[in-house]
Amino acid sequence: MAARRGRRDGVAPPPSGGPGPDPGGGARGSGWGSRSQAPYGTLGAVSGGEQVLLHEEAGDSGFVSLSRLGPSLRDKDLEMEELMLQDETLLGTMQSYMDASLISLIEDFGSLGESRLSLEDQNEVSLLTALTEILDNADSENLSPFDSIPDSELLVSPREGSSLHKLLTLSRTPPERDLITPVDPLGPSTGSSRGSGVEMSLPDPSWDFSPPSFLETSSPKLPSWRPPRSRPRWGQSPPPQQRSDGEEEEEVASFSGQILAGELDNCVSSIPDFPMHLACPEEEDKATAAEMAVPAAGDESISSLSELVRAMHPYCLPNLTHLASLEDELQEQPDDLTLPEGCVVLEIVGQAATAGDDLEIPVVVRQVSPGPRPVLLDDSLETSSALQLLMPTLESETEAAVPKVTLCSEKEGLSLNSEEKLDSACLLKPREVVEPVVPKEPQNPPANAAPGSQRARKGRKKKSKEQPAACVEGYARRLRSSSRGQSTVGTEVTSQVDNLQKQPQEELQKESGPLQGKGKPRAWARAWAAALENSSPKNLERSAGQSSPAKEGPLDLYPKLADTIQTNPIPTHLSLVDSAQASPMPVDSVEADPTAVGPVLAGPVPVDPGLVDLASTSSELVEPLPAEPVLINPVLADSAAVDPAVVPISDNLPPVDAVPSGPAPVDLALVDPVPNDLTPVDPVLVKSRPTDPRRGAVSSALGGSAPQLLVESESLDPPKTIIPEVKEVVDSLKIESGTSATTHEARPRPLSLSEYRRRRQQRQAETEERSPQPPTGKWPSLPETPTGLADIPCLVIPPAPAKKTALQRSPETPLEICLVPVGPSPASPSPEPPVSKPVASSPTEQVPSQEMPLLARPSPPVQSVSPAVPTPPSMSAALPFPAGGLGMPPSLPPPPLQPPSLPLSMGPVLPDPFTHYAPLPSWPCYPHVSPSGYPCLPPPPTVPLVSGTPGAYAVPPTCSVPWAPPPAPVSPYSSTCTYGPLGWGPGPQHAPFWSTVPPPPLPPASIGRAVPQPKMESRGTPAGPPENVLPLSMAPPLSLGLPGHGAPQTEPTKVEVKPVPASPHPKHKVSALVQSPQMKALACVSAEGVTVEEPASERLKPETQETRPREKPPLPATKAVPTPRQSTVPKLPAVHPARLRKLSFLPTPRTQGSEDVVQAFISEIGIEASDLSSLLEQFEKSEAKKECPPPAPADSLAVGNSGGVDIPQEKRPLDRLQAPELANVAGLTPPATPPHQLWKPLAAVSLLAKAKSPKSTAQEGTLKPEGVTEAKHPAAVRLQEGVHGPSRVHVGSGDHDYCVRSRTPPKKMPALVIPEVGSRWNVKRHQDITIKPVLSLGPAAPPPPCIAASREPLDHRTSSEQADPSAPCLAPSSLLSPEASPCRNDMNTRTPPEPSAKQRSMRCYRKACRSASPSSQGWQGRRGRNSRSVSSGSNRTSEASSSSSSSSSSSRSRSRSLSPPHKRWRRSSCSSSGRSRRCSSSSSSSSSSSSSSSSSSSSRSRSRSPSPRRRSDRRRRYSSYRSHDHYQRQRVLQKERAIEERRVVFIGKIPGRMTRSELKQRFSVFGEIEECTIHFRVQGDNYGFVTYRYAEEAFAAIESGHKLRQADEQPFDLCFGGRRQFCKRSYSDLDSNREDFDPAPVKSKFDSLDFDTLLKQAQKNLRR
């Protein structure tokens, strides 16, 4: 009423929304509660189209917007619009004043309100007055809303989701007096309220009237509502709802921005999806201008409206004043809403109930005539920035995209308020922007949807006016948004911007004063107009400054945001309106320019109005990208991660359409650029989940860049952005409206929706399908990260180029999304240098940079909907951690080699940014880590967060743990790193991260020779990258394998080390490996070569060649175990797993030096705990240690050699599976176990030992054998060197091979080996032991040539390893020949026989007889070493003896029988410390083996291992049982002591209903009770015992305990316990009860383990 009075007095209501004539018009002076919020203004006060928001108590979500469209309503002073109608009051009063149909409508509305709308009696009266006025004014020209509504419809019960529709505009102002009624003394807001007919937005869905956009636009007098017209209610059959001209009713709904009744009704079916808030008057203006630029005049609009009403809701029809009339109004009432000639103002009424959930806002925007761009509402409008929703011509659109907002410029103040409303209603959860053409984000901001919806309604009114013509031409854009405080970014942004602009503009505020309370749609439009007018940031800032004052309720937050934005000189965000205006690529410009970012990326906007505002601001920023991308305020910056997006919004933006908004990625994110006649600006399916403010914010930020662009388009000025598309939108709205506003999300109303979906599907196909729909914080990206590792690279790679192309093609938009994430700048021509470098981008847009990661994530979504769009954006949006979520994809870092290709693949959405960032792949974070060392791996994820694109890299941390090893390798391959991003679809994130982690690329540089090729391979040769990918996938499981497989990461390290030893050859080979799967093998070989040095190098060459062929096939397999082995063997003597381990030590130290150590650390990270535990616990563990170290070496090699070694090793394990290798592995397993079993245990051990690759048993097995082989080879070399050969040569010495291997490293690189093993494997203890012996042994066997030769044989052990000149021949025969064992024993013969020794190992496994002498020699040698090497030495000794043993099976069995006992005993004795136990078991093993054949010893070891384990387990159990018995005994003693101390009180005659706790509670009054028990007996009294801490308390209980009984209870029988309690346990009741409550001490479990005991116990239980 205050607003009414203010209007009458010509006083603008206070912007504060106070009860006085403030924007809220007193109707809702203080809050959203019963009165329309001040920010919305007294809806009635809004000129053009006032919206009375019947705001639910809930707030934004529910409110009825009475849109007073025509000046007539304004003139009639429809103050009731500003009033909030209470359901009950409204119904009662209405019933008294209205006919049944009207009452029914109201009732429906009330039902919608669900008593959430608390309407004051005043409001009721106002509403009645407005209705009366409408009815009175009804004439042939101005149909009564009710006239156009069939009685049946009027009587129809409210439908769900049609509350906005039910909020029917009671009257429609004449077109000339439509939304824009300069007459309004208070300004557009007040004037429009007065001038416009009452616009009743009834949330009740049953109101079939489409939102009275006509109300907004048309005067209430218009007889738009014709009862005769039976138009299917939106809710019922949106598709059938068409105007007589055939246009879909949806169009009308869009025109009736408020869609009060109509939209509410539509909401039932289509409106629900098509929330009242058409959201963008500007859009309407655009579409209307373009489509309906020619629309005849108000007359046509009226007729069109009638038709529309027929198709849509009658109430809508009046609102749909023809654009011409609307334009007339604009001219006549510039203050009210100065829309460009082609502009349609959408007034959207947030429907409290419907809007809360999902509202689609059909926005019909006429494209502004190119010429009339300044057709801003008026000079007065211009005066009022908000009013001046300039409908920029195409030419000026670029300059002032905001002008489109003119639609909303109905009221500047209102514009803000309206915008808010729109934000609440219109932007309420726009699930999808059905409008392919309309890139209006208004739908996005759900928080502000209600205010935005009002404004949209107003826009729609005008739109409705021009709708007749424009409807068909333009698409009605439906934005589904939840009206409960969730606004799409676009709308919210608009409202925010509007508020910012408008608030600074007092005149605008005056105009929108009443509306600002609740009917902010017009204020929003006005704000847009003002923003357009003040295209410069200062206007925006000023607006922001004033915005906060103007917006009180929900808008308050926006003002704050706006203020912050405004505070920040960067109008970019703020520029959503202003900057958009100022920026060459404003929404209008977008519309005008096909390049304009059609897709509104404001995807899920935070429910939080503030967030929404931020998002909106960000969107705005995006659109006005030319303005400073600098985020206006941190919050804005966050939500404005969009800022980067802003950049892409440049004219080049057109392609950006596809870019989905961060969270928006849900679905609408990538609405195709609508190829509508206007700009291809596609309506982004702004399917935002405002419910999650954080998500919304994130999506704002996340979508910041791209979403921002879109959001700016959409949120900036949904109409503005949409305006170009308005035509399409209108059409779409009609069609969609017909289809179903409710199902708007489900049904692609406009092409843009279809396109969007199509694109989304494509993106999903390209990248893992990440439903954008769950943008809220899911970590789909995380889940996808694991799956995407291998898959994404391939999938992404092909799509990436295409997407990239598309993104590049429209870098503006993609960058908008991608820009931030991937490097908006690179991807987008839209100049945002910062984008080009994520870091730079973040500097440019400090907050945006932060947001950028978020956006970056959305960008990946853009790349591939599945990868990041849905989840990543949401994650991104949800939290900076999204980077973590994306981080998962960063896990991909392992496949850095592929990143080059991956960047492409990764960049389905981000390809461009990614490509730009390719150097800065998401891996950069990992590279960053890599430089530090594998241990740093986890940091990279953090680093990315730190980096300019923290959000993007929040995810990498996610995977960082699993991928820690890979990341290190990745560092060398900076560009390759993109692979991970690609696979993960966090590419954008990665890219930013890379920018942050350019240093990692340096490592690649150091490894330059290997790295470049790996990159090439990853990019050019999918096979190679696939290898990487597979290893990467496995990488988390096996760091070694990963490094090996992920040559990129591991390889670089290796290469670095490698160059020193065998740099030339390894380089060449590494290159080859990089180029092809061989690369990995080569890398490994080269690393090995380095380790072996010259001999190794020579062998490496042939081996590499062999390995390549083999490895290549295996690589594709992800890890052909045999091939890896072969590869490994060439690199290292791939004789036995143990040998390999040894070799690992040597080569690893040599080859990888620090790199290897780093790799070891990585492995350590993943494997340390498990490996140690498994190895330590079992003798196998010690063997596992050998194996693990080999894998570690393998990893090291992989790292040093470009990951080739690891992969080969991993594959080699298959070869190693051969008896010899298995024998080596046997160290882990008891000698008795078959080679396969050995292998399996090895795998298990490896799994335990290294978390890296063992995840896959096969991988583990292969890796482990690989490692074992390497270790063994080194061990063999050492043995040969030290003449320990015999003991070491035999395969059976697999257990001890690790010792031998240790030896070899000392010779080559003992120090490195030790650190590597220790750091890398958490086998530190093992390795320490091994290393020590190795060091001592190393000197013993110093001859490097010997090592080389030995290595060859060892490698030969895997037949391919024999690639070495001599080894090849020997391999087959020697494997089978038993002579190898002696050779092994003898250092001289060792080299040639070594292969035979390996073979012999195989035989040993086969249990083939072997010469005893070699065995004994080996055993002796090993034994000596064992004493030196302790556990590792002994293990190797036993291994050697077993391998060299040629004794018969009988001796074997004998040794088995002897050895296992010793071993077991030793083991059990040493069980306390894994190392000691290992040593002792090894020693015992070796001693027993020495006494018996090595073969028997080997088998013995196998059998021994398990049995000691069993023993130790048994011992543990015994000890545990003993401890349990001890505990029980202690309890008994304690009880006895308590009894003796008289602290136990016996309580007899306990009632049966009493519980122990109750008893304890009763008697606790006497003191602290230590124990309380109750014993129930079938016969006799129940009794219990209470043990007090002190005897005095027990005495007190006995003396006074009887007083505790209740009246209905018998007195307790109290005495000191012990008398009966501890009588002989002959009392069965006592006994059983005691066991029940107090289990008797259990005898040692062993006693109960034997059958007799168990049987007795069972029988005893049965007897009980």
UniProtKB/Swiss-Prot annotation:
This is Peroxisome proliferator-activated receptor gamma coactivator-related protein 1. It is found in: Nucleus. Gene3D superfamilies: 3.30.70.330. Residues 1379-1450 are annotated as: Necessary for interaction with CREB1 and NRF1. Residues 201-224, 522-531, 862-873, 1365-1383, 1427-1459, 1468-1500 have a biased composition (Low complexity). Residues 1543-1619 form the RRM domain. Residues 1096-1113 have a biased composition (Basic and acidic residues). Residues 23-32 have a biased composition (Gly residues). GO terms for cellular component: nucleoplasm; nucleus. Residues 455-464, 1400-1409, 1501-1519 have a biased composition (Basic residues). Residues 1-44, 167-255, 436-555, 681-701, 735-793, 818-873, 1045-1068, 1093-1130, 1182-1209, 1334-1528 are annotated as: Disordered. Acts as a coactivator during transcriptional activation of nuclear genes related to mitochondrial biogenesis and cell growth. Involved in the transcription coactivation of CREB and NRF1 target genes.
